[in-house]
Regions:
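Short S/T/G/P-rich N-terminal loop/turn motif that feeds into the first structured element of a domain
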Residues: 1-34, 39, 50, 88-105
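Short, well-ordered beta-strand segments in beta-rich or mixed alpha/beta enzyme
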Residues: 4-9, 44-69
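Flexible, active-site-adjacent loop/turn segments at secondary-structure boundaries
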Residues: 8, 13-16, 45, 72, ...
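Pocket-edge positions in alpha/beta enzyme catalytic cores
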Residues: 18-21, 56, 82
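Alpha-helix boundary/interfacial micro-motifs
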Residues: 19, 26-28, 54, 65-68, ...
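A short linear hydrophobic-aromatic micro-motif
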Residues: 37-44, 79-81
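An amphipathic, aromatic/His-enriched active-site/gating alpha helix that lines ligand/cofactor pockets
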Residues: 58-88
Length: 105
């Protein structure tokens, strides 16, 4: 299945209600992903501009977009989602574009 990276920011409401609702909301987000045929592969909680980086699989872009809309509508997070390819897929793509030419040619 295609892989997607979601960059997530907590809203002010999300931060203010984290203690009471944080775990429940996290589980709801995961259920929403799964209801669209997706799968949460991993999530990393971060310092900096984004609060969470999630790695997900979805059957297609439409399902990924639906998940972003549904989960953003919960009000506690803002989501930016983008398709991603693995390092191996990237290398295959480069070979398809340029073949197996030696460096400098």
């Amino acid at each position: 299945m295609p892989v997607y990276v979601s960059l997530v920011k907590f809203t002010e409401h999300g931060i203010a209600t984290m203690k009471q609702e944080g775990i429940t909301r996290s589980e709801k987000v995961q259920r929403n992903v799964e209801s669209l045929g997706g799968r949460l592969l991993d999530a990393y909680y971060c310092l900096g501009e984004y609060d969470v980086v999630a790695i997900l699989e979805f059957p297609n872009n439409r399902a990924a977009m639906k998940a972003a809309v549904i989960n953003s509508s919960l009000g506690h997070i803002k989501i930016t989602t983008m398709p991603a390819v693995s390092r191996g897929e990237w290398r295959d793509l480069l070979r398809e574009v340029w073949g197996n030419k030696p460096k400098g040619k």
